Amino acid sequence: MIMVSLIVAVARNGVIGRQGGLPWHLRDDMKYFADTTRGHTVVMGRKTFESIPEKYRPLPDRRNIVVTRDTSWFAKGVDVVGDLGEAMEKCGDGEVFVIGGGEIYAQAMHVADRLYVTEIAAEVEGDVVFPPYIVGWREVKRVPHQEGEWRYDWVVYERS
């Protein structure tokens, strides 16, 4: 059976992206992301895929599925699909991670079973936001962390 999980780092004001990238560089959070998603399928939008540094594309040790409306788009080492439903059909059983961006998160929120949220204790400027997620979810794990000037919590929510 498939379990759909969203994994995201989000500022207090909902921001998750700025000008095609992340508004922060958090090495420990990137390691958490890699450790959590390794060995699983990851689903992302084309812009998210293209925002990943080229040397890390496709994300290693994971099946990469990219959702795009551009039927001619191609990238080596990834499965390309036209919509989120098609992506879910390709996933098979096990936990699949939706990793962004904003449009894909909004579409996947209603089918998600679990959220892995890095809640950053700051408000930042940005142009991509994560959909509201407090209602309908219960917190099952919280681990506080500090990295330089950044304070954040790794939080896991399950649908209530």
Describe the function of each predicted region:
Residues M1-L6:
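Extreme N-terminal starter segment of soluble prokaryotic enzymes
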Residues V8-T41, R46-S160:
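Flexible, gly/pro- and Lys/Arg-enriched active-site loops
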